[in-house]
From Swiss-Prot:
One of its GO terms (biological process) is hemolymph coagulation. Secreted into the hemolymph. The keyword Electron transport does not apply. GO terms for molecular function: lipid binding. Transmembrane segments: none annotated. This is Fibrinogen. Residues 1-20 form the Vitellogenin domain. Its main location: secreted. It comes from Pacifastacus leniusculus.
Amino acid sequence: LHSNLEYQYRYSGRVASGIP
């Protein structure tokens, strides 16, 4: 169950950068 974690981590990074 690492796919969800990775997705969340990447999503958080993108949001922080301001990239949709």
